[in-house]
């Protein structure tokens, strides 16, 4: 492992600009250090991205499910475990994701623009989407795309 390069892990970031409009940016995490996660564990690449209280959810979106326009309730990492889902931001960008793809949602403080506020999300295809959500007890910064490196 000593010759392995540092990882580069991509994620989608749903964020709010200074005008209250949500956007999605494709970002890359590259800040990792090689360390053991426990005293007797072998070294591995670790990138601590948040250090606040968190709640973990597993949610199942039924096939054909489409939610209403809404903001993320709190900043949250969302990782599909199975199935596919989409997120559409207020700027009209639609991102489709499947198992293992990562999204960070923090579209807080958006304003209603033509009936759209926050984002729209739903499932794709004939299968439910199983999502793992790690939700944080921290307010998001405004207009900070790709803030996790």
Please give the residue ranges for each predicted region.
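Short acidic, Pro/Gly- and aromatic-enriched capping/linker segments at domain boundaries
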Residues: 1-16
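A short glycine-rich, His/Asp/Glu-containing loop-to-beta-strand
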Residues: 16-68, 129-131
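Short, Lys/Arg- and Gly-enriched loop/turn segments at beta-strand edges
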Residues: 35, 110-121
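Short acidic-glycine-tyrosine-enriched beta hairpin
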Residues: 60, 91-109
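Histidine-centered active-site/metal-ligand motif
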Residues: 70-71, 119
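A short beta-strand-loop-beta hairpin characteristic of the jelly-roll/cupin
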Residues: 71, 77-99
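A short hydrophobic beta-strand segment most commonly corresponding to one strand
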Residues: 104-105, 117-140
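Acidic/histidine-enriched, glycine/proline-rich intrinsically disordered or flexible terminal extensions
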Residues: 140-149
């Amino acid at each position: 492992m000593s010759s392995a390069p540092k990882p580069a892990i991509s994620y989608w970031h749903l964020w709010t600009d200074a005008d209250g409009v949500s956007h999605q940016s494709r970002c890359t995490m590259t800040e990792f250090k090689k360390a053991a996660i426990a005293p007797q564990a072998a070294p591995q690449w670790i990138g601590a991205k948040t250090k606040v209280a968190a709640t973990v959810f597993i949610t199942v979106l039924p096939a054909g499910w489409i939610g209403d326009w809404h903001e993320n309730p709190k900043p949250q990492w969302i990782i599909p475990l199975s199935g596919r889902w989409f997120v559409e931001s207020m700027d009209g960008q639609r991102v489709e994701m499947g198992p293992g793809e990562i999204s960070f949602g923090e579209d807080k403080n958006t304003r209603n623009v033509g009936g759209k506020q926050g984002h729209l999300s739903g499932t794709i295809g004939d299968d439910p989407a199983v999502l793992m959500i790690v939700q944080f007890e921290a307010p998001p910064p405004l207009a900070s795309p790709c803030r996790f490196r």
